[in-house]
Amino acid sequence: MYLYIETLKQRLDAINQLRVDRALAAMGPAFQQVYSLLPTLLHYHHPLMPGYLDGNVPKGICLYTPDETQRHYLNELELYRGMSVQDPPKGELPITGVYTMGSTSSVGQSCSSDLDIWVCHQSWLDSEERQLLQRKCSLLESWAASLGVEVSFFLIDENRFRHNESGSLGGEDCGSTQHILLLDEFYRTAVRLAGKRILWNMVPCDEEEHYDDYVMTLYAQGVLTPNEWLDLGGLSSLSAEEYFGASLWQLYKSIDSPYKAVLKTLLLEAYSWEYPNPRLLAKDIKQRLHDGEIVSFGLDPYCMMLERVTEYLTAIEDFTRLDLVRRCFYLKVCEKLSRERACVGWRREVLSQLVKEWEWDDARLAMLDNRANWKIDQVREAHNELLDAMMQSYRNLIRFARRNNLSVSASPQDIGVLTRKLYAAFEALPGKVTLVNPQISPDLSEPNLTFIYVPPGRANRSGWYLYNRAPNIESIISHQPLEYNRYLNKLVAWAWFNGLLTSRTRLYIKGNGVVDLPKLQEMVADVSHHFPLRLPAPTPKALYSPCEIRHLAIIVNLEYDPTAAFRNQVVHFDFRKLDVFSFGENQNCLVGSVDLLYRNSWNEVRTLHFNGEQSMIEALKTILGKMHQDAAPPDSVEVFCYSQHLRGLIRTRVQQLVSECIELRLSSTRQETGRFKALRVSGQTWGLFFERLNVSVQKLENAIEFYGAISHNKLHGLSVQVETNHVKLPAVVDGFASEGIIQFFFEETQDENGFNIYILDESNRVEVYHHCEGSKEELVRDVSRFYSSSHDRFTYGSSFINFNLPQFYQIVKVDGREQVIPFRTKSIGNMPPANQEHDAPLLQQYFS
């Protein structure tokens, strides 16, 4: 036994040193400096060293001895800055060990990779000491960032994985998953920088079920000494719910960076395919270590992940996704084999061998190596391919849930957040701007863009066509347009938000008298100034809440301008009675077209077009209908007007009207349901009625209709009532109502006799059910299953998915006030207290 253990220790140390050497070889000088000095900066604590702060900061790493580089650094501090380095006190030190995890040291590490560092500490540290250590780590992150190195520290209590804690998407961590999969990744990718060796590697795979007993036997026999090893526990079996939660979160993360996430998403899919007897990759690597099979280029965890995914996709004969995952792997390694290198490193050798096995030709290598120069056609093709792969994973996840008798709403908040994000990113809707470049290519800018308008009555569809070339007949005729839409606003928005249109792009337009070049250039300047291209990704909280308009542009008279008729005419009007909506003797409306362009809190970009005399009324009703009563006001509202005449006047009046109506909408309350705004358009009076759930518009022909409409809205307040009796909603539900989503609100009755359900459909029509009995969880499961299986609303190529699943909420009382919280299958009161301060950053790391 002793010789066997010693042999294992030697293999472990050899592989760890190999990984350290490989990590340093792939790094630049600044990266090497940070990587090498981090253990020293955590072992010591001194005002002249980075990361210093006042207080009793835990210092000292168990079994740490400075290497040559670290000793040189300490000697320099002593020699040139007069620093006297004091070793931490003897005995068991607070920091058990410092480890990197993830792609560092693997073939997947690149010059742009960041560093994920686990600082494992003794469980006897108190709360204040942990906070001080966390603050020191934050200071070290800032120091590294000043050198151009991205480092993330994660404090790990040595006993945390024995608690089987879980989190939720709403807490911005890894969803309904326990920590076993995180531990799986740590065990297969960890590199020890300083401190204790990892004990788990010493336990044979066939003893995993009796992990603790086997470890105690090793200690009792004196084969191992307890205080020389980091013991985070064994890899126990995983439930179907845990796979579901982990896969859900990984799919969620893959939306923003699909190339990076494809391999890990498919590894989890492979695990679920093998369920209930999965082979965790960490166990596979450990088995080979024990057998002395140092395969896969030194048990490289990234290569072994590819190997496992290849086995899975080959077994199910999914060669389309297999080809995709190989390309993703190639791009991640970033070696560019089509270009000659003077120095051939180990990563290049690995990739060359794999490419030879895959039988790739030079043309494919050149195409992949040129990814930085991919333009819209290649990016759109890649986007569709990644989307198809993601949808396949989503469908397989739902099948896995059904196969194992799980509800797709086993965690309704989590599935709600994922579906909202999928819906926001991919559901194809009229007027929605599809963003096709989630970190696929760095630059889609085009030197030339041409907008061509085809009027009605021609062979081609009437509307606007966009080309990425100058308007010469030969090039236009021989190429397909990049995009078509009936309205110019949508094409400009698509080109801007996808990065084709920049300040350097030359614009051309063949507008057939509808829009000329100066007007197009003005619009492009206004849109680019008002809408930033890059925004932070929406938080899970934002995705679970009703969407809210964040940036709004109201574009007036872009395609139809009534003031153009004033040219060379004498127009009589009274400045004292000037009304741009009922102008002059003929009471003409000077707003002929309104285009809306807005970005919401889910980061969707939407466009809408309204034409004709009532365009202002229709646009107002639409804008206000998208603002639920408790919504925050938009961050910005801009009116852009492109009239030939009276431009400033029209713009100011529209801005005033919109601001006033938004104020009325967002400030209306249950006690003031009769608020209204009268507006005269083209000589006719219209009433906008600000009701509890939406805004209605009514034409008011005379005084009797006018006052009748006001009193009716004061009395009822609802434009639609499904019940014959008056529907009385809790005020907190009024504020949460949002168009476009089916919402269920559960409310406990005061006499504790069942519960009430308030259901708002996508048009905010209301149904109320009082004193319901039975299981809310079963209702949530059945409703979600019905919508996920029978309401296919999303169509993209061969993919059919319903993303707009109902949302479920619970009305609760907190400090005597009613609040709405996401409904969870486990009541808040019964949930174990979660240490979010420690859990969230760690779990973010695993699924990043």
From Swiss-Prot:
Query: What are the GO MF terms of this UniProt record?
Result: adenylate cyclase activity; ATP binding
Which domain of life does the UniProt lineage start with?
Bacteria
Q: Which GO terms describe its cellular component?
A: cytoplasm
Its BP terms in the Gene Ontology are:
cAMP biosynthetic process
The primary site where this protein sits is cytoplasm
Record flagged with keyword Nucleotide-binding:
yes
PTM Phosphohistidine: at which residues? H609
Q: Which residue intervals make up region (Catalytic)?
A: 1-535
InterPro entries from the UniProt entry: Adenylate_cyclase_1 (IPR000274), Adenylate_cyclase_1_CS (IPR024686), Adenylate_cyclase_1_N (IPR024685)
Q: Which UniProt keywords apply?
A: ATP-binding, cAMP biosynthesis, Cytoplasm, Lyase, Nucleotide-binding, Phosphoprotein
Q: Which PROSITE patterns match?
A: ADENYLATE_CYCLASE_1_1 (PS01092), ADENYLATE_CYCLASE_1_2 (PS01093)
Catalyzed reactions: ATP = 3',5'-cyclic AMP + diphosphate
Q: From the UniProt entry, list the residue stretches annotated as the region Regulatory.
A: 541-848
EC no. given is: 4.6.1.1
Localization in the cell: Cytoplasm
Into which family does the record put it? Belongs to the adenylyl cyclase class-1 family.
Q: Which NCBIfam families match?
A: PRK09450.1-1 (NF006977), PRK09450.1-2 (NF006978), PRK09450.1-4 (NF006979)
Q: What is the recorded name of this protein?
A: Adenylate cyclase
Which species does the entry assign this protein to?
Escherichia coli O6:H1 (strain CFT073 / ATCC 700928 / UPEC)
Q: Which gene encodes it?
A: cyaA
